[in-house]
Design a protein with these regions (language model features):
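Hydrophobic beta-strand scaffold residues
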Residues: 22, 97-98, 126, 154, ...
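Active-site nucleotide/adenylate-binding loops and adjacent lid/helix of ATP-dependent enzymes
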Residues: 4-7, 11, 67, 108-199, ...
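ATP-dependent carboxylate activation and anion-phosphoryl transfer catalytic cores
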Residues: 248-339
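ATP-binding N-terminal substructure of ATP-dependent carboxylate-amine bond-forming enzymes
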Residues: 1-104, 108-110, 114, 132-145, ...
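A glycine- and small-aliphatic-rich helix-loop capping segment at beta-alpha/alpha-beta transitions
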Residues: 89-98, 174-177, 309-311
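Surface-exposed helix-capping loop/turn segments at secondary-structure junctions
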Residues: 17-20, 196, 266-273
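Phosphate-binding site of ATP-dependent enzymes
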Residues: 171-259, 280-287
């Protein structure tokens, strides 16, 4: 997913030869960095490099044959250690400007419980939930009673993973324990959330910062393979889901969801870009589901589709994100800090 997103971003930016010289960097699952000739999966011709903290260079070949001074980094990376504040913190340590949310917003956005708490404080409706911790253990009977009280189904989700990894729909209380055990394979904390009958999944994209935020048209994703938008429907089954942009919802409802998307993004202290996901019931009531602070960026991803529906040019959005990254870095550099 990260590779597909990065390929699109690299292609669009590489077409702007008067503005950018693009250096694609591949990071392996082992954490090793490689400079690529063309953005894509790992290739034998990729050059091993290492990030360094120097005034004259940020990236140096392991054989010493070359070095690069990066003006800005576009961390088109998804998942653990990528969009959860880890990479952002590393780039802060290198003192390199980078696109997207900072350490705090990235970390909070990746945590489903923290982002729900922030959404609630921002006045955005959320669904009831419980947290299960691997370390603390859990009272299965109490959780089953809570699930029955809320009304089945409930959804069990790892707290700090993507929207589809490790997720199970629990239709009976007898299924709850196996769903918890499954999710706890992927994270130390698990969210048990009340389900929504006949839920529609509505999305809104955001870019900018502070008072200069733009929200996209709302889009809807319908699952073709399976009962909900799980990992199988998202990545495995061809045509497992269908996207409709703009979503077929009343204009006033779409406007309210856009406003709530902006409210969550601002409350999270977001900067750069994000996609905010909602669940809507059959009566038109909607609830915040999660925020993705580095959404998919490929041509078929929701982020470019949602802004394209508003007449926004993808290349200009990328230009704006890079310019914002430079402004944010300059603003931090101007602060009086005791280092």
């Amino acid at each position: 997913v990260s590779v597909h997103s990065a390929q699109t971003v690299c292609r669009v930016l590489s077409e702007k030869k008067d503005k950018y010289e693009v250096y694609p960097i591949f990071i392996s699952k082992q954490g090793r960095w490689f400079l690529q000739k063309a953005c894509g999966p790992q290739h034998p011709t990729d050059k091993p490099i290492t990030p360094v903290l120097k005034d004259e260079a940020n990236l140096v070949a392991l054989d010493g044959s070359f070095s690069i001074k990066a003006d800005v980094v576009f961390p088109v990376l998804h998942g653990t250690n990528c969009e959860d504040g880890t990479m952002q913190g590393f780039l802060e340590t290198l003192d390199v400007p980078y696109v997207g949310c900072g350490v705090l917003a990235s970390a909070m956005g990746m945590d489903k419980e923290i982002s729900k708490l922030i959404a609630r404080e921002a006045g955005v409706p959320i669904l009831p939930w419980k947290i299960v911790s691997k370390e603390a253990g859990y009272d299965l009977s109490a959780l089953q009673a809570w699930a029955e009280e809320q009304g089945l189904p409930v959804f069990v989700k790892p707290v700090r993973l993507g929207s589809s990894v490790g997720v199970r729909k629990v239709k009976t209380v007898g299924e709850l324990q196996s769903a918890l055990e499954f999710a706890l394979q992927f994270d130390t904390d698990v969210l048990v959330e009340k389900g929504v009958d006949h839920a529609r999944e509505i999305f809104c994209a955001i870019y900018g910062e502070g008072v200069h935020i733009k929200s996209s048209a709302c889009g809807e994703l319908s699952t073709v393979a399976g009962e909900f938008f799980d990992y199988n429907a998202k990545y495995i089954v061809a045509g497992g889901c269908e996207t409709k942009v703009p979503a077929d919802i009343p204009a006033d409802l779409a406007q309210k969801m856009r406003q709530d998307s902006e409210a969550v993004f601002c409350a999270l202290r977001g900067s750069g870009l994000a996609r905010v996901d909602f669940l809507m019931d059959k009566n038109g009531a909607y609830y915040f589901s999660e925020i993705n602070t580095m959404p998919g960026m490929s041509e078929t991803s929701l982020f470019p589709q949602l802004f394209s529906a508003c007449g926004e040019d993808y290349g200009q959005i990328l230009d704006g994100l890079i310019a914002l990254a430079l402004r944010v870095h300059a603003r931090k550099a101007a602060l009086s800090l005791n280092r």
